[in-house]
């Protein structure tokens, strides 16, 4: 690690300790509604040296080439960057970067305002295994730890194994050791907002058991789970939709169930599996999954997502779009999970504008459409904070439900 990175980390920790906290300690995922937080966007002048990272498409970031389908509502950000896109009146469209603390602070302020309990910070093993990615994700994580304690929100590490090979276990375990030292994950008094579960700090591992020919497999997954257990962590596992039946998107290997039984929480991946029309035929999986988990003394976190779109990422082929219908699709899922007895909820995602699942504030007025880069505007009749409000209402209902059951 370079002196610059060490100094940046030290300053971030010192700032976090200096601002104080609301004294809110998160001892359990039960009773919480959280979202995934990508934090992977960059702008050329934000200091990260990554250009328009994750905003750009196959041919850079310009009209006709971008990976994002939604455009953020930028009216509340302190710092913004000019883009190559313009609006119909010729004004330059601008975007934020989470590499800036002010951007992350704004996001956590929204979480507090609308009642979202917190976020799982996505930490891509491939990204943090290279200097540029590690520098970026360490910076965003520093910001998030500071903002989480400032606003009394829960925060937790979620590792994404996508694109990894058979060395994934050693990379992940080395990284969590470093993160733990930097952010005092084992010391709840020093970092009260870091999410614990079943008496231990929680770490999420996403991408276990998928049947899409990944270079790592269940042997590597077992090494990760064993390594985290030995280090004293509670574990949430992100698995395919049909994990229980071992079919379709899931490896047909019963060892997956052995690994699941060693974990504390299970979260199956539902994004893109249904739309508003097909959800009623799909949703029976949730209570059936819950029953299996109860039988094996595992907590279950069902996933809800507000919609989906990756037209720009995959234009013109595979331009999938699952409409939001002004929130009715999202509300349908939230309602069913709460009525089915969910004790915790995971929302995909807070800031995912690449695949159109973001619940943070997005814009109705979007840049001028061009072939290959047509942005999806916010539905008419709702405010940019509509999905944050729906998530916050679900969090209130969840807490009331659990109180009634006690």
Q: Residue ranges of each PLM-predicted region?
A:
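Secreted/periplasmic carbohydrate-active enzymes, especially glycoside hydrolases
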Residues: 1-2, 19, 35
């Amino acid at each position: 690690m370079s002196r610059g990175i060490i100094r940046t980390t030290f300053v971030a920790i010192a700032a976090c300790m200096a601002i104080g906290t609301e004294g809110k300690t998160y001892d359990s995922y039960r009773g919480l509604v959280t979202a995934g937080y990508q934090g992977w966007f960059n702008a050329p002048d934000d200091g990260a040296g990554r250009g328009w990272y994750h905003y750009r498409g196959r041919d850079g970031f310009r009209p006709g080439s971008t990976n994002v389908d939604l455009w953020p509502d930028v009216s509340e950000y302190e710092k913004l960057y000019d883009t190559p896109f313009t609006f119909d009146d010729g004004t330059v469209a601008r975007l934020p970067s989470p590499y800036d603390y002010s951007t992350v602070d704004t996001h956590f302020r929204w979480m507090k305002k609308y009642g979202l309990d917190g976020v799982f910070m996505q930490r891509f093993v491939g990204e943090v295994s290279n200097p540029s990615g590690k520098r970026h994700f360490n910076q965003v994580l520093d910001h998030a730890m500071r903002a989480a304690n400032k606003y009394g929100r829960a925060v937790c590490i979620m590792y994404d194994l996508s694109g990894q090979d058979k060395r994934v276990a050693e990379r992940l375990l080395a990284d969590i050791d470093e993160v733990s030292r930097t952010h005092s994950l084992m010391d709840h008094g020093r970092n009260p907002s870091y999410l614990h579960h079943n008496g231990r700090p929680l770490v999420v591992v996403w991408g276990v058991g998928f049947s899409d020919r990944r270079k790592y497999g269940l042997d590597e997954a077992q090494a990760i789970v064993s390594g985290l257990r030995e280090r004293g962590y509670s574990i949430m596992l992100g698995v395919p939709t049909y994990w229980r039946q071992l079919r379709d998107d899931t490896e047909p290997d019963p060892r997956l169930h052995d690994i699941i039984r060693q974990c504390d929480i299970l979260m199956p991946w539902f994004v893109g599996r249904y739309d508003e029309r097909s959800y009623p035929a799909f949703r029976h999986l949730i209570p059936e999954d819950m029953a299996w988990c109860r039988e094996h003394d595992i907590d279950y976190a069902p996933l809800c997502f507000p919609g989906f779109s990756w037209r720009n990422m995959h234009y013109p082929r595979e331009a999938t779009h699952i409409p939001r219908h002004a929130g009715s699709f999202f509300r349908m899922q939230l309602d069913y999970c709460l009525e089915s007895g969910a004790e915790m909820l995971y929302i995909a995602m807070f800031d995912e504008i690449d695949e159109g699942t973001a619940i943070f504030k997005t814009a109705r007025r979007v840049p001028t459409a061009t072939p290959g880069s047509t942005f999806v505007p916010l539905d008419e009749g709702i405010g940019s904070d509509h999905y944050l409000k729906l998530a916050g209402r679900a969090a209130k209902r969840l807490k009331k439900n659990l109180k009634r059951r006690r």
